[in-house]
């Protein structure tokens, strides 16, 4: 989340938001102003409840914490601009490495793939390119097209393997963002739909790590 100092009528208030990212803070403040204006009441009446606001599933959603203390976030970003926005939003929350796992969907917007790779290579410290929903396309070809924009990234076929690699890279102060699928619960590969959810897989991996430690 984030702690924010907000000045209202000359008085400074400290508020906490469970939401991550500057743009989400601005959205909350805009909504706060609209509600206050509509109901004719003071903004102060709503400040104490801001910490109860829940984010949209799959939108910069915090899904777990690695044993090292590193937070793990998922997001639906699947365009260069969206990927840029989330990486820029997450950077202030990272003291160590920003690790990004992402792919690109098949059968659409092929021209965006190298640009997504370029964005990740510039804004993330570790980039792992993997499969999204390849649909009827070759997953390997999609990854290779992304890699044109980030030749130093790690190319990992299989989303679960890529996420596992991302988790293994985490240390105290790091943050892992898994982009592209958000809260989706299925993956489309070669005309077949299989169950897969980023958050559920991460939780299974974290449970295994905790079990090994115990």
Language-model segment annotations:
Residues 1-14:
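Acidic-glycine-rich active-site phosphate/pyrophosphate-binding loop
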Residues 15-22:
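A short glycine-threonine-serine/GTX helix/turn-capping micro-motif
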Residues 10, 20, 30-214:
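ATP-dependent carboxylate-amine ligase
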Residues 5, 23-24, 51:
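C-terminal accessory "lid"/substrate-recognition subdomains
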